[in-house]
From Swiss-Prot:
This is Swi5-dependent recombination DNA repair protein 1 homolog. GO terms for cellular component: nucleus; Swi5-Sfr1 complex. It is found in: Nucleus. Residues 1-18 have a biased composition (Polar residues). InterPro entries: SFR1, SFR1/Mei5. Belongs to the SFR1/MEI5 family. Residues 1-40, 59-82 are annotated as: Disordered. GO terms for biological process: double-strand break repair via homologous recombination; positive regulation of DNA-templated transcription. It comes from Xenopus laevis.
Amino acid sequence: MESTSPHQGSFYKSNLCSPDSPKDTVPKQPMSATLRERLRKTRRSFNAAFSVAKRLKVDCEENESSSDCPNNNLPPHEDSEPNATKIEVDLVSEGDICRLDSRTSSEASSPVRCKDHKQLLQEKKLLLKKLEEQEDTLRRLKMVKLYRAKNNLSELQSLIEKWRKSSQLSLYELQAALIAENNKVTLSQLIESYGLDENLLHYNRTEEDFQDQ
């Protein structure tokens, strides 16, 4: 069996656990001012009270070193913060003005709309009333037409004349019968007692006789 010396063991440990080996270490690169500015502006946009679109202002291009920037010694927020705040205030102010204008215009037009709505309701009521009147008139005309179709006016006139003559004869006979019984009764008294219409009977009260006779 081969024996290992203390120097060889320490050599193996140094090769396995040494932090200075080129495989385990990655050289750290310093963060540029441009990248820091981007991170700061991005963080401020997330924490802002209003979400507004901001344009990131970069003082130095990414391909240039920090020594080429003229304002590298100044704090990064002094150059861009006033502009960003101004843009945000301007955008919020314009939004408030637009909302105020739209609200004012809607409130101004609401009385006009209400007036137009009332006028339309009144016109609707008038049209419905006229429509009902026309429908009622049409219904009456249809009834008259139906009545005339079922009843012949000439036939009705002949029936009325027959009724008048028969009524007159009946009254004459009744008056003669009552006189025979020593009851003197006039035709006017008989017509009134039976509730007959003098105009239909063609009775003349002055002469106390029928006009057709």
